[in-house]
Amino acid sequence: MALNAGCASQGDVKGRDFEMSSVMKNDIDLVAETHQRVVFNALRQLAIKLYKRNPQEWKKAGQPSLEMAVKTITANPLPLIANISNIEQIRLAFDERYQGDRVKAYIVGLEAMVLASYDNHRSFYIHHMLEAQKLYDSARNIELASWLIRKKYKSNGKLFLLSSVGTPEINLSFERLFGKMINAQDMMAQIIADRSHRQ
C-alpha cells in the first residue's frame, strides 16, 4: 500500500479523441503526430516565456497582448516572412538591422524548420514516408538555436533576447523545453531509421 501511495499519479495523461481518419493510420503515423505535437507544444511554451521576458517584442508588432501575440505566431498556417528560409528566419532574430519582432522570427523559424522535417505535414497516413536524416538534422538545428539565444550578443553587449539568464529555476525551465524538443526529434529520427532498416 505504501508503494502505491508513493507512486500515485500527480496528473492525468489524456490521448486524443478517436477520429475516423485514424483508421487510415499505422502506429508510426500516430507516433509521428504525437512527437510533432510535443515539439509544437514546447515551442508555444517557449514563446510565452520569451515574450514575458521580452515584452518589447510583441509590442513592436502592434499586438494588444502577449496572449494574442502567441496565438498569432503559433497559427496554422505559420506567419512566415516571405522569401527567406526557416533557418534564415531564425537567424533574423539575431540580426541588429532587423527592427521587427525577434521572438516571432525565432519561434516561427523553429516551427517552420520542425514542420519541414515532417515534410510539412501535421497529419500522417499510411502512404507518408518520413526521412530520419531530416528529423535528426532538425534536432541539431534546435541545439544551435538554443545556443544562439543564450550566447548571441548585440554590439552594445546586451543579449538579443533575454531567455535563461537569471535564477537557476528560470534557466532550468528553458533548458527543459529545449531538451524536450531535441529528444522528441531524435527519438522520431531513430524510430524512422529503425523502420527503414527493417524494410
Segments the model singles out, each with a brief description of its role:
Residues L3-G6:
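C-terminal motif of bacterial Sec signal peptides marking the signal peptidase cleavage site
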Residues A8-V103:
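N-terminal Sec/ER secretory leader and immediately downstream segment
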Residues S9-G15, S22-L30, Y51-N54, P168-Q199:
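Short, cationic, amphipathic peptide segments
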Residues K59-S196:
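Mature extracellular/secreted ectodomains of secretory-pathway proteins
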